[in-house]
Amino acid sequence: MAKFVLAGKADCPYYAKAELLADVLQRNLPDFHIHKIPVPPDDWKEWLEDTCASNGWKHSSSPLVWRELIDRGGKGMLLGGFSDFLEHAQGYYGITSDMKSDLMLKIAEENQATKELCMEEEVHRLKSLRPLHIWISSALNPVCYSLIPHLFTPGLFSGLPILSLHLMDTSGSEEMLQALKMETVDLAIPRLHEPAGEYNDEQNDKDQVAEHFHRYGQLIETNAQKDVRVLVAGDFFINMKCSLLIENAPSIDSRNFVAMTTQLEYEARTQLAQKLSVKTSDITNVIVWGNISGSFHIDLQRAKVFRYDGAIRGPDGFSQHVMEMIYDWKWLKTDFRSLLHKHRATISSKTNKATAISTTNAILAILKAWNNAESPEEVFSLGVLSTGQFGIPAGLVFSMPVSFTDGHWSVRSDVTVTDELRVNLDACADELRMERDMAAKTLKNNA
């Protein structure tokens, strides 16, 4: 089966003549197939150079004709220009073209007009898409390989928006980021707009968290829309990263920046569930205070357990307070905290990988709550900018209890701060102030 590709400048009369000859061959020969590529005149030179370079060809004029050994996309064998194609058609098929010059010029004009119209329609189509733009930093992290497919889950974002993914990373190579982009395209998801890879190797010290997120904040301030929403997740300095973004994007509402505590909250629920011999999903309303990746405090004052096999049983929906079901106070004060601090590291040491699945699940839980209608009774923990709630110093990004209503979060005011909790909150605040001062010192020294 003969498979040919015909490419040329859209306004080239010889491309028009070759196109007509190819149509005649395809119409009369059952095994002859042609694929046409009309290229805008302004783009032709660059397109031709790139095509020839990638295939090892030498050709300098329009049109360009080659034969593919398998279906379009396979290895190509250069045939040449118009004269070569005409000679090939005469020699192999006994068919030639007798198109006159004035008709060639007329068809060339029509080709150019058609190409311009198609380009205008494509521009209009892209403008009318209005995709939801999602930027992912550290896109080469294993978490992203798990996260990206789930971003297209129905119900995660209100409506079914077209998603435009922007993948950024400074720790790997441009080739690795390009490979991730190719894998994303291979998902073949209709709601995926063309993903973009944004590789940046300008930073000399990629491990400098302060420098890194100081710059990210400036980029958000300069380029992002004012209703942008930013979720910070990770294993180190999460509160500080979120704080730096807020400081360097002053025109963006600080409520649009949050640090993810959910993974830590779920890990606490897992330890409690194992202690009570229930499923993790049977534990709810666990509150995490403080520094998400540092000194934090697990508050169980509102925590509930469902389907607990104890002396008191009830129907579906019946719950009991976790604090009343756990009688081992020594375990809560010692082993519980120790297990929680080691949990993520234990998993990573066994798999030699980051905790990608649980991190992905936590990110999706917050995205779903933040972008949809959630029950105002459900308690989440979230790192947000303090305005002095619960006596926490204003200006610190601090994990505290929140609830989501109509796509917005609000701090829960119905939480009691005991004397013991106050001591823990003060200790967390002191550590966060130290991290903030450290970041400020780093930025000052590098200025």
Curated annotation (Swiss-Prot):
UniProt KW keywords: NAD, Oxidoreductase, Tricarboxylic acid cycle
Assigned EC number: 1.1.1.-
Pfam families, A to Z: Ldh_1_C
EC category name: oxidoreductase
MF GO annotations: L-malate dehydrogenase (NAD+) activity
Record-linked PANTHER family: MALATE DEHYDROGENASE
Protein's name according to its UniProt entry: Putative malate dehydrogenase 1B
